Structure formats: C-alpha cells, structure tokens
C-alpha cells in the first residue's frame, strides 16, 4: 500500500468517502487480504499492457497517491460489477469544505463573460465566474465573494440553480450553480488572470456555443440550468 496510515486515518475521519451505499455495484474493499489481491490483480493487468514491472508495482498500490492543499488522489481497492477485484483512482477534496460556486451574471439583460487564461489548458477561455467555496461561508456567501473578485460586482438578485458534478468518472467534486443580476461591474482583481469582461447578448452567447467558442463545462451547465428554469 501507498501511505497506508494516512489512508486508514481518512477511513476513520471521513467515512462518507468510503461508504458502500445500498445498490452500489462498485464496492470499496478495506480488508488487508482484499487490498493485496487488488494490487496483485492490477499489477498483472498493467504488466500485460506492456508497463514496466517497476511502474506496474507503483501504479497498482492502493492508498493515498497524492495529497496537497488542493487535491487528494486516492487509489482504492474495489470489486467491479463483474466480480473482478482491482483498483480505481479518484480525486476528492483534501478536507470537508463548502462546494465550489459557479455564477451566471446578468447585466442589463446581457451575460457577462470573462476572457480568462487557464493554466491547465494553457489557453484563453470564455467563461463565467467560478471558484472554490470559502471556508466557513455558505454557498451564497461564496458566490457573492466570487463576483466581487472576478467582476467587481455585488448581486442585486442571486438565484440558486442547483448542483453540478463536473466529471463523475474521476472526481467527487460538486459545485453550486447560481444565476445573478448585477447593476454594475468593475475591474477584476489582477491575480485572477482575466483579460477582459464581455457583456454578451443572449443571441451572441448561444451562437458562441454553437460555434464551439464557449467550451467551458461550468458555463454550459449554468446556461442550461437557467434556460430550463425560464430565467433566460
């Protein structure tokens, strides 16, 4: 196992991360024998794919694969729906925290898009404000703070649009969507890497979606939810 003490501390401190709810068909295994079996099975599978023995051993280890203030990567021993035992990797929040927030801001009937440089893709994106949840804050309070940071704006109206799980195949991340109406907007904080704020009519916004110019999943989700609620 990789970092077994840290892994089993998590099992005790955050049992919800390791729950097997009724009807779960991918089952987390916590017994030592089952974990050893999962590691052996995965190592053999990786070797069969041409992975070196050293890497196969490393990539098959169950436990905490990586941990910092932003990310916690777990590799769990699991039983798959066909009965096979192996391992499965996932990203979870490093601590219990307020969900992230995503805000669709409306100014004088137009959507405020940000031209935002993102390190992960090394490119510019058209997207709406979003960010981590603030410790000790409600989601609504986090949304208000995010609008101040990225738009220099205070919302006149803030409407919850529900939750989104952006990538259920790899991460447990869950974020809260909001619709916001603002009377004014200003200048984003410099550290936010925002090039400009673009008031965008709905017709143009939808054309940017059709033309594959807007590709940010959070932006698309908030738009779809607001449309379905009759807010746009």
Give residue ranges: language-model regions.
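Conserved Nudix-box catalytic region and its N-terminal flanking loop in Nudix hydrolases
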Residues: 29, 91-94, 98-145, 191
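Short, well-ordered beta-strand micro-motif
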Residues: 75-79, 105, 179-181, 199-201
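Nudix hydrolase/Nudix homology domain
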Residues: 1-41, 120-124, 169-170, 175, ...
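Short alpha-helical functional segments enriched in proximate histidine and acidic residues
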Residues: 150
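Acidic, metal-coordinating catalytic segment for phosphate/diphosphate chemistry
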Residues: 57-102
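Active-site-adjacent beta-strand/loop module that shapes the phosphate/pyrophosphate-binding cleft
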Residues: 78-82, 167-186
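A short coil-to-beta-strand element that immediately follows conserved catalytic motifs
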Residues: 154-161
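N-terminal positively charged helical leader segments and presequences
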Residues: 23-65
């Amino acid at each position: 196992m990789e970092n077994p003490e840290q892994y089993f501390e998590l099992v005790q401190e955050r049992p919800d991360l390791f729950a097997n709810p009724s009807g779960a068909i991918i089952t987390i295994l916590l017994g030592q024998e089952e974990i050893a079996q999962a590691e052996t099975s995965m190592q053999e599978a990786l070797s069969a794919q041409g992975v070196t023995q050293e890497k196969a051993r490393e990539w098959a280890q169950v436990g905490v694969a990586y941990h910092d203030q932003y990310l916690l990567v777990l590799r769990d021993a699991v039983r798959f729906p066909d009965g096979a035992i192996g391992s499965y990797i996932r990203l979870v929040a490093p601590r219990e925290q307020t969900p992230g927030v995503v805000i669709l801001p409306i100014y004088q009937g137009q959507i405020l898009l940000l031209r935002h440089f993102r390190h992960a893709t090394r490119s510019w994106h058209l997207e709406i404000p979003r960010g981590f949840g603030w410790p000790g804050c409600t989601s609504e309070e986090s949304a208000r703070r995010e609008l101040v940071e990225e738009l220099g704006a205070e919302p006149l109206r803030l409407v919850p649009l529900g939750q989104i799980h952006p990538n259920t195949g790899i991460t447990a991340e869950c974020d809260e969507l909001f619709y916001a109406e603002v009377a004014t907007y200003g200048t984003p904080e410099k550290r936010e890497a925002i090039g400009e704020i673009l008031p965008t009519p709905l017709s143009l916004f939808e054309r940017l979606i059709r033309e594959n110019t807007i590709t940010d999943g959070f932006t698309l989700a908030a738009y779809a939810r607001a449309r379905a609620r009759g807010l746009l």
